[in-house]
């Protein structure tokens, strides 16, 4: 079943899409360091990230300094929610670079 999933790679690339499995978001040579699910909160201009990838586990944000986000998502804040309700403000904690 196609679901809204995201991954992050060791090179700092953030990729999301409607896929069956998180590994479907990988490109050749990517090393995934976690993923999860997402939804858009248009009221607060946020992309809400949560849960974890069955394939790759929870995102390992601590391994990154820069997150490369598709430019189409410019203007959205990225926020990850852990299972215990703790919030990690990705947009505040990491340097965000946009790519086309």
Stretches with model-predicted labels:
Residues 1-100:
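Eukaryotic phosphoinositide-binding membrane-targeting regions
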């Amino acid at each position: 079943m196609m679901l809204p999933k995201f991954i992050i790679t060791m090179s700092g690339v953030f990729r999301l899409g409607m896929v069956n499995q998180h590994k479907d978001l990988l490109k050749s040579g990517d090393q995934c360091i976690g993923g999860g699910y997402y939804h858009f909160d248009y009221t607060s201009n946020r992309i809400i990230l949560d849960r974890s990838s069955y394939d790759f586990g929870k995102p390992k944000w601590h391994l990154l300094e820069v997150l490369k986000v598709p430019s189409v998502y410019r203007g959205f804040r990225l926020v990850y929610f852990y299972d215990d309700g703790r919030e990690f403000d990705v947009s505040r904690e990491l340097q965000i670079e946009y790519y086309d």
